[in-house]
Regions:
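Conserved interdomain linker/interface between the two RecA-like ATPase lobes of SF2 helicase motors
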Residues: 287-345
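Conserved SF2 helicase motif VI
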Residues: 424-444
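Conserved helix-turn-beta segment of the N-terminal RecA-like "Helicase ATP-binding" lobe
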Residues: 167-200, 365, 369
Length: 502
């Protein structure tokens, strides 16, 4: 039996039995639930998914990655390329010999060279990408994913598409290829050959094309995606775990590449939808270890207290906590002290509104501009300038949403992270905490500062991220006194808010 490998693998329906078809469809059908514990307590758990499940609020949907399609006059079972080796083995185990006709593109471009230096572990990771061609490189934050990706592209010298969900991450790749005011170019690629592409002409005329996944969301974007489907030998996807996994999967399932690599520091997702991306791109092919600094824990009590009864909307809890004026004052005063000790401070928030208030208060109390807003609303040149200035320690403090400050922002000089957000997301916590642990000569000992609110939900969230991420992964240093205080804070249930004279 001959199967065709393109943007997907197409299996002729006539050559497999209905039983094999159903087995493949079952294997590529995924159901998602908000909380597994709720299902375990349900009397219908042994029969899920059934009609009862589909009407339950805990059921978050079903995704079928295998589908029947018609090409010309023939019918095929279409399956994702990432899962195709397993599907082919399933077919061969039933006595059917499979021959794969590979129709991946082969578009070489004028060669360009990598001229940077490698850190420990990077060469092995590049070899793994060359060997497996498809899959996910699990690399911790600050391990040099852009360096490894750029080196891979140079080695192959083929037309390349680099996808990400945020422009800042793409600019990191561009900076690695062609340099910037603060970073030398690590390749000899002509800057005219790389571009953040938006139009068909852009994609056609550049050898290294950068694009946000949002470029392909609209009807016009879908048409553009269809037009460029077979143009790229090499497709790199940065931080595959961050955006909506189903959106990433939809786009990746429509692209035909020979080398397709996803980068992620934390492939696991709280909603478990990483399985969708892994079936499209491929499994984890290599896991890196990286050198990072050891954080020290500092504690600050905010005096903020909140008592709730019954079910309270999450947004209400976040809004009340982040906009509390006395709490903002506490954060601002502490930021000024940490900056005075030489730290470059990152302050993430869940909502946009508090950002302006925190920045204003820090600068008011300091009597000069120390803090800057870092949000998606900033104009692109200004965002780029802020990143450069923070690297040079011209900017002492950035305040922004946790999504923007947690992933893809390369500021090695950042040395102090404020844990102020109501969050219990383990993959995101790992990304966020790693931001301040990049080794750099002359950098202060990195600090992760916990702001302690007398608020039950806040304690539970912080406890979860502290014991399941910070302690086992980053092995922080904490004084006996602070350790006793933090453990007491986690244990306490009664309101015992204490105010420091800040």
């Amino acid at each position: 039996m001959k199967v065709v490998k393109r943007e997907a693998v197409f299996i002729p329906i006539k050559d497999i039995t209905p039983q094999i078809q159903e087995r493949i469809k079952d294997k590529l059908t995924f159901n998602f639930f908000a909380k597994e514990k709720i299902c375990e307590e349900c009397e219908w758990v042994a029969e899920r998914v059934n009609d009862v499940c589909e009407s339950c609020a805990n059921f978050k949907g079903q995704y079928q990655l295998a589908s029947q399609v018609k090409l010309g006059s023939s019918k095929y079972l279409k399956v994702p390329v990432g899962s195709s080796p397993e599907i082919i083995r399933l077919i061969e185990d039933r006595g059917i010999e499979v021959e794969v006709r590979d129709m991946s593109p082969s578009t070489k471009v004028r060669p360009f060279k990598f001229k940077g230096k490698y850190r420990p572990g990077q060469v092995e990771a590049i070899k793994a990408m060359l060997k497996f061609k498809r899959g996910i490189l699990k690399a911790p934050p600050r391990s040099g994913k852009t360096v490894m990706g750029s080196s891979l592209v140079c080695h192959l010298s083929r037309k390349t598409l680099i996808l990400a969900s945020q422009r800042d991450w793409l600019m990191g790749f561009k900076e690695t290829f062609v340099g910037s005011d603060t970073q030398p170019a690590l390749t000899d690629l002509d800057p005219k050959r790389i571009k953040l592409c938006k139009t068909l002409e852009d994609f056609k005329t550049h050898d290294v094309c950068l694009a946000t996944v949002q470029t392909f969301y609209s009807p016009g974007g879908e048409k553009l995606l269809k037009a460029i489907r077979d143009w790229f030998d090499v497709i790199l996807v940065d931080e595959v775990h961050t955006s909506a996994a189903d959106k990433y999967a939809q786009i990746m399932a429509k692209l035909n590449g020979r080398y397709v690599i996803g980068f992620s520091g934390t492939p696991d997702r709280k909603d478990t939808k990483e399985v969708l991306v892994e079936n499209i791109i491929g499994p984890i092919i290599h896991e890196m270890k990286t050198e990072r600094m050891q954080p020290h824990i500092r504690l600050t009590r905010t005096g903020y207290s909140k008592t709730t009864k019954g079910q309270v909307p999450w947004a209400y809890l976040v809004r009340g906590m982040e906009n509390d004026k006395k709490r903002i004052d506490c954060i601002a005063k502490q930021a000024i002290r940490d900056i005075a000790e030489g730290h470059m401070v990152l302050i993430p928030t869940a909502q946009v509104k508090p950002i302006k208030r925190i920045v204003q208060r820090i600068n008011e109390l300091a009597g000069k501009t120390l803090a800057y807003e870092f949000t998606g609303g900033l104009k692109k040149p200004l965002r780029d300038q802020y990143i450069q200035d923070a690297r040079d320690y011209k900017i002492k403090c950035l305040v922004g949403t946790q999504k923007i400050l947690s992933v893809g922002i390369n500021i090695p000089r950042a040395s102090c992270l404020y844990e102020t957000v109501l969050s219990s997301n383990l993959p995101n916590a790992q990304q966020r905490m790693a931001r301040v642990l990049t080794p750099m000569e002359g950098k202060p000992t990195p600090i992760i500062r916990f702001f302690l609110d007398d608020f039950g939900v806040r304690k539970n969230c912080m406890r979860n991220e502290y014991y399941r991420v910070l302690v086992p992964i980053f092995k922080p240093v904490i004084s006996p006194k602070d350790k006793e205080m933090l453990e007491s804070y986690f244990r306490s249930k009664e309101s015992n808010a204490q105010r420091f004279d800040l």
